[in-house]
Amino acid sequence: MKILIIQNRIGIGDMIIFLPFIEAISKKFGVPVSCLLKKNTKADQILKNNKFIKEIIFLERDKQNGKHDGFKGSIDLIFSLRNCKFDKVFIFNSSLRFNLISKLSGIKKIYQYPLFKKNKQHIIITAQRFLNKELGINVESKPIINIDNKSISNAKLKYNIDHNFKNILLGIGGSGPTKRIPPNIIIKFMELICDTNAAKFFLATGKDIDEQIILKEIMNSKFKDRCIPLDNLNIVDILPI
């Protein structure tokens, strides 16, 4: 049996939130699944040690310029999925587009959120109700990312992670402006932590100009000597930290 999961939200955090639901489907049918995900999710790096996921297929959409954008892009995606010969698909959205793509790809059994009901969908509760209704399973939202012990040990040595300090990883970026925390709030958080703890802060962010502005302001603050920026690293290098 070959199963496809479609999750088209753009962010890394969104992808991680859906991870327990993806794994629950794999466990239910006893086979690892394939996932159609946005490239921005960095899923190929984050999920490389996940035994429940067989392969990552990237959905390449970028403001009408991506491989899978528009009518031609949909046709390309249909042919790609048809060649995979999936038996079932679970679509974690209410998109008619993905419903039609799945049907035209020859997938016989399609499970999907109710069509045309995107508004006011709670990201976790909607997914929980979806799998409970379709498969009769209850899924807790407790995502776990598997990281091998050797990578963790190497990161401790490389970044001098001392357990006498509070070592705090701060995700100061975000997949959009509404998901980014202003730098003054992050700096205030650092003040509160450092009032009572010896702390070191690892700053995880991307190269987006708005994220770099946040990083620069933090690195120009009085906490700069306590901060280690991680913006030049891949996700696979950051995770063991």
Descriptions of predicted regions:
Residues 1-241:
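Catalytic machinery of carbohydrate-active enzymes
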